[in-house]
Curated annotation (Swiss-Prot):
It comes from the Bacteria. InterPro entries: BH2638-like_sf, UPF0223. Pfam families: UPF0223. Signal peptide: none annotated. Belongs to the UPF0223 family. SUPFAM superfamilies: BH2638-like (SSF158504). HAMAP family: UPF0223. This is UPF0223 protein lwe1035.
């Protein structure tokens, strides 16, 4: 898919990388499946860059509009996961 990630131009390169890695993990949850621990770790790093719930929600909505992938739905599934790997159903 061709789309751009919702990034804040005020972030450092390292912060942008962390956000992109989290969004790529969301993509993997839909496309191939992902280890729940890995995704939780990516989310913790993401929250260091984006601590505000409002900004997290805005990024999630913008990402879903661009990609069709819901970070919110993935994280809800991870929160309640009983398996070591998750894969979202389209």
């Amino acid at each position: 898919m061709e789309y751009s990630y919702p990034l804040n131009p005020d972030w450092t390169t390292e912060e942008m990388t962390i956000v992109v890695q989290f969004l790529e993990a969301i993509e993997r949850a839909y496309e191939k499946g992902i280890d729940t621990v890995e995704l939780k770790d990516k989310y913790k790093e993401f929250k260091q860059v984006v601590p505000a719930k409002g900004e997290e929600k805005r990024i999630g909505i913008d990402f879903e509009k661009a990609s069709g992938y819901s970070a919110y739905k993935v994280m809800q599934l991870v929160k309640n996961a009983t398996t070591s790997k998750i894969k979202m159903q389209p």
